[in-house]
Amino acid sequence: MGNDTIANLITSIRNADMVEKGTVRVTATNITKNIGRILLREGFIEDVREHQEGQKSFLISTSKYRRRKKRTYMTTSKRTSKPGLRIYSNYREIPKVLGGMGIVILSTSQGILTDREARQKKIGGEILCYVW
């Protein structure tokens, strides 16, 4: 039984936001790096960087908070496709999250993409998670 690094990343960020902890450290893999870059680009997190400790590589994510309120921009995230049950979609059937306010992160043949990028390129793939 392997580790689900995507669920670990999403759960760690969500738990850190609930206790108002600013940074999260998770194991770095190619998928978690790409998801971190997407969350940074879409404005859900403030910073993401890679940290090396000996042979192990970690991804350090910093949450982005609203000005006066201590709430984060990333209100909820949900892991959709799991190791035991993969969920695939073509580009026409990719769901919209909150009418386009959230994003769907997909694993496609051209890499990890958001729902908008996948629709634009007209490619489908495995639905990894929803973020809003």
UniProtKB/Swiss-Prot annotation:
It comes from the Eukaryota. GO terms for cellular component: chloroplast; ribonucleoprotein complex; ribosome. It is found in: Plastid, Chloroplast. Disulfide bonds: none annotated. Pfam families: Ribosomal_S8 (PF00410). One of its GO terms (molecular function) is structural constituent of ribosome. One of its GO terms (biological process) is translation. Keywords: Chloroplast, Plastid, Ribonucleoprotein, Ribosomal protein, RNA-binding, rRNA-binding. Belongs to the universal ribosomal protein uS8 family. Part of the 30S ribosomal subunit. One of the primary rRNA binding proteins, it binds directly to 16S rRNA central domain where it helps coordinate assembly of the platform of the 30S subunit. This is Small ribosomal subunit protein uS8c. It comes from Pinus koraiensis (Korean pine).
